[in-house]
Amino acid sequence: MEYILVIFCFEDRAEDLKIPTFVPVSDLISLLGELFGTKGKALHAEPRGIILDKNKTLAEQGVEHGAILTLE
């Protein structure tokens, strides 16, 4: 199984996460909400500077190791 290592930033926290490459962003948003009690409808990726498509995975959208993800 392949993974992407990312930094998830929310409120005043940052967490290193190892995300399987096959997980769609919509599922990832739900999982992050459950794990960290966060709310958001979109996931933003830096340094790409894009709002991620909920129907695609991080890998399909070119998100690479070390990317910073934030909920919007």
Annotate each language-model stretch with its function.
Residues 16-20:
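Generic structural detector for well-ordered beta-strands
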